[in-house]
């Protein structure tokens, strides 16, 4: 499908579009089609004009994904700074009837925030501070968007996304928006089941009121801790592997002697062993090969099979 096949679009549609610049690893091939919607309503218009069997891939900050060098079949939709609405919502409108969780809406010192999928978690954390909501500070440590955080139950510094969620909006392939509650999903550590060929487009988050100064202090402390322990400013995806029960992936990788291990220009970080860096000219194939090497070596040394946190997509 070419651009002339679409009407009424206010966003930007590209064909055969390079994707590396949209990922934090700065690697990956091209998308057959790439769409940057103007907003949520424009996205709906776009989806209604796509064939029902068109493969869809959703991309936010590109921080938890490895796109293979052969690129992606179908259409890639960029949500970052496109689905960007962020606001305190009227408690009377947010899931009262469907959820049955009256305690969320009774005042009770709580505030409900609606954040669309393309809002960065860092921006959500800062918004929480502006509202004096101390328990949203952990979002500052998640290097991604709200959509990605919802899709994988992202977490940082002891906080997890779905502990704060009271409802979500999803969109299906036809552009229809559905409101759903947490009990419709199976929530696990870094995994969410039950999306059923839909995509998260917004989340409703419930936070406790607190001291704004304490909230700001909490974020600054978390960011300082992250900067000391992680290779911030380098081309990476964040954590590559999930932490196994009762242990840490970084400890297992480091104790296996893999810090500094490289394949091509992909390298296990010397600062944090659960980070793989693109030293400048790595291919997606280099990074994927190093991921497999690390997992295999840790399994041989420790007898523990690490599970990938990063999503690997596209064609080789």
Swiss-Prot record:
Entry annotated with the keyword DNA repair: no
Required cofactor(s): FAD
Transmembrane regions: none
NCBIfam families per UniProt: murB (TIGR00179), PRK13905.1 (NF010480)
Enzymatic class: oxidoreductase
Keyword list, A-Z: Cell cycle, Cell division, Cell shape, Cell wall biogenesis/degradation, Cytoplasm, FAD, Flavoprotein, NADP, Oxidoreductase, Peptidoglycan synthesis
Pathways involved: Cell wall biogenesis; peptidoglycan biosynthesis
General function of this protein: Cell wall formation.
Catalysed conversion reaction: UDP-N-acetyl-alpha-D-muramate + NADP(+) = UDP-N-acetyl-3-O-(1-carboxyvinyl)-alpha-D-glucosamine + NADPH + H(+)
One CC-aspect GO term: cytosol
Any single Pfam family the record assigns to this protein: FAD_binding_4
EC number: 1.3.1.98
Residues of the active site: 190, 239, 309
Family matches, as InterPro entries: FAD-bd_PCMH (IPR016166), FAD-bd_PCMH-like_sf (IPR036318), FAD-bd_PCMH_sub1 (IPR016167), FAD-bd_PCMH_sub2 (IPR016169), MurB (IPR003170), MurB_C (IPR011601), MurB_C_sf (IPR036635), Oxid_FAD_bind_N (IPR006094)
One GO term of the biological process aspect: cell wall organization
Domain FAD-binding PCMH-type: 27-225
GO molecular function: FAD binding; UDP-N-acetylmuramate dehydrogenase activity
Keyword field contains Protein transport: no
Taxonomic source organism: Coxiella burnetii (strain CbuK_Q154)
Protein family membership: Belongs to the MurB family.
Protein name: UDP-N-acetylenolpyruvoylglucosamine reductase
Compartment(s): Cytoplasm
């Amino acid at each position: 499908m070419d651009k002339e096949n679409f009407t009424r679009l206010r966003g930007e549609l590209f064909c055969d579009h390079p994707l590396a610049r949209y990922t934090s690893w700065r690697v990956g091939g091209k998308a057959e089609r790439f769409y940057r919607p103007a907003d949520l309503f424009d996205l709906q218009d776009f989806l209604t004009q796509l064939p029902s069997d068109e493969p869809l891939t959703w991309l936010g900050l590109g921080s938890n994904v490895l796109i293979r060098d052969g690129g992606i079949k179908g259409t890639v939709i960029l949500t970052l700074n496109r689905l960007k609405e962020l606001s305190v919502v009227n408690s009377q409108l947010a899931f009262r009837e469907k959820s049955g969780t009256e305690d969320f809406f009774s005042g009770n010192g709580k505030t409900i925030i609606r954040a669309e999928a393309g809002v960065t978690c860092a921006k959500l954390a800062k918004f929480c501070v502006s509202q004096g909501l101390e328990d949203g500070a952990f979002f500052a440590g998640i290097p991604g968007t709200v959509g990605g955080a919802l899709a994988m139950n992202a977490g940082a510094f002891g906080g997890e996304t779905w502990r704060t969620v009271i409802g979500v909006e999803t969109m299906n392939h036809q552009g229809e928006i559905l409101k759903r509650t947490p009990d419709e999903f199976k929530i696990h550590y870094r995994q969410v089941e039950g999306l059923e060929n839909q995509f998260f487009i917004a989340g409703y988050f419930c936070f406790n009121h607190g001291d704004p100064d304490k909230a700001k202090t909490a974020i600054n402390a978390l960011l300082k801790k992250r900067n000391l322990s992680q290779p911030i400013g380098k081309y990476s995806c964040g954590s590559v592997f999930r932490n196994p029960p009762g242990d840490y992936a970084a400890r297992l990788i480091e104790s296996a002697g893999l810090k500094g291990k490289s394949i091509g220009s992909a390298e296990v970080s010397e600062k944090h062993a659960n980070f793989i860096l693109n030293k400048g000219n790595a291919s997606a194939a280099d990074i994927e090969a190093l991921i497999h090497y690390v997992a295999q070596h840790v399994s041989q040394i420790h007898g523990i099979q690490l599970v990938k946190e990063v999503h690997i997509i596209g064609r080789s």
